Amino acid sequence: MAPLSRVIIDTDPGIDDILALLLALSSRSDEIEVQLISLTFGNIDVRSCLRNVVSMFHIIEQELKWRRENGKPEGFDALKAFKPTVAVGADRPLDDELMMADYFHGRDGLGDIHYSHPHLTPKQAWESLFSLTGNGTAEAEVESALDGHHSSFVASKKPAYQEILRVLKENEPDTITIIAVGPLTNLALAAAEDPETFLRAKEVVVMGGTVNLPGNVTPVAEFNTYADASAAARVYALTSPRPQSTLPPLNPSAPKPLPAYPPTLSKQLTLKLFPLDITHPHDITRGQFRAKTAPIAAAGSPLAEWLSIILSHSFATLDALHPGHDGDKAALSLHDPLCVWYALTRESPLWTLSAGSPEDIRVDTTGQWTKGMSVVDRRNRKRRDDDAVSASDHGHWLSNLAGNRVQRMEGSPGTEVFGGWLLDRIFGV
């Protein structure tokens, strides 16, 4: 039976990214098939992102062994049915300075677990699988040092954007969903390299932006969009009947500006946007997490131990940063896992779009205070029936053919149920 969703997950693992990956990989094989995990800078540098993903697979292998030895259902059917490729991608934005969210996620992206609990991190030999160290380590030596702990994934030595295009070429059009939960740099590079192949995607599900809520990195910008605003603008532009109308201006200081898209393309990109407006209310509290995982960790679950260490850092950071986030009520928003939940349950009628979808949502790439802002036209202005250029329509906001066509997700199967459901799925209970 074909899975409901075949996906590429483009990610910058961080804490909620890891939860998103665990949710996907622990699901049923008839629900999802993770063909590629493409890594980008974001929450931390891309090398740390790679270490975090390899560590996750290392812990999953230990968890499966523990479950077998204790007579428990193994779970992780999606992972056992299809071994995903892992590819390293962009290490910096297209044309801006690198920024990270290590203030929240820790120096290593996972609450500093690699420093505080190094025994939970696999040996460094895994780097050679991805040609990152250049130390000439033989493949056999790498296999021996890893002791089988990369048996759940395929390591790619190609850039992530090339792997994205490969997966799209090897599958039928409109069968691959790209779930993008980090800066959109890898997607922008893939689209610039081969826009028609990129448009073979069924849809691109983006965790990014904020429309009616404040930002989380500036007063108006969400982190993923802010971290590479030009990349986000370029990907959003593919939803437009005329992508040139919303492409960001060229940055003359950029090392290698990406080319404009061809004047005509075969189709418009389907982009489902999950902004902070919908992701922020979906959370998990410290009390909820402890109640679910403490007995499992006490019984010896490697995964419960690992996640308990990581999330304890998150909840402590929330205590320090946000008034009201303390004790068992401290709540971690499940931004990235929500996008995976959609891929798993996309047929539910409870997933609803905004009344105005598709919306002309554009990304500001140059503003001193508004870079990364998701800009919408809140004026009560009538759109023009013709598509002629109008001197009074600055930015072509009122033209029928200009502007983006973004489908903004507004409703889900339930903010109250997701956190518990996520933990039940990951721990197989």
Task: Show the residue positions of the predicted features.
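Active-site histidine-anchored catalytic micro-motif
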Residues: 2-68, 73, 79-82, 93-98, ...
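A conserved beta-strand->alpha-helix junction
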Residues: 86-92
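Short, surface-exposed, charged loop/turn segments at secondary-structure junctions
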Residues: 101-104, 193-197, 218-225, 286-301
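Conformational coupling and interaction surfaces
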Residues: 3-4, 21-33, 226, 230, ...
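Extended, histidine- and acidic-residue-enriched regions that form the cofactor-binding/catalytic faces
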Residues: 99-101, 321
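A residue-level signal for conserved active-site and pocket-lining positions in enzyme catalytic cores
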Residues: 86, 235, 340
